[in-house]
Amino acid sequence: MSMKLAPGDPIPSVGLRATDGYLLNLRSWVTKQPAVILFFGAPTLAGAARRKGANAIEALAAGFDRLREAGIAVAAVSTDSEQQQTDFATSQKLPFLLYSDERRSAVEMLGIETVAKGDNVNVAQPVAIAVDRDGIIRAVIERVEPVALVDQLMRALSEPIPVAAEDATTSS
C-alpha cells in the first residue's frame, strides 16, 4: 500500500478515540491550529518494528515543548485498542494523547501500510504528517528518522507549500 495523500491534499475526516476517552474528528481537530500526527506501531509489536515505533514516539515526546511553543498540536495514532493505547501512554509518560484506529479507518484512508500477525494489525513503520490550520497536509514523512523528526515537522509547517511543476506551467 502506498500513501494516498500528499502535500497539498486536505486531511480526511475520520473519527478516532483518544486515551482519555475523547472522540476526535481528525479534520475538525487540525483546523484549530497546525498539527503533527504520528502514525506508529509499538504497543503490541515486537522486535525491530516495535523499536522503530517507540523511537519515533520518544522523539516526538522529547520535542513536544518545542512544538507546543510554536503553536503546533501533537497526537499519535496506532491501530491498537484504546486500553492498549492508554497502558502504553501511561508507561511512556507521554505529554500528548494517543488515538486508537482499531478499525483501521484512518490508516486505510491515508494509505498507511500495516502488517498483521494473526489478529494483531499494526502500522508497519512510523509515518508523520504535518497539517496546517486549514487542514491541508504540508508534509508526509514516510521514513521517520527520530533525530531529525521534530525539525522536519517544524520546517514543514513554517515554509510555504511549493508549487507543483504542472501547476507552475499552467499558471504562466
Task: Give the role of each language-model region.
Residues 1-172:
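Chalcogenol-based redox active-site neighborhoods
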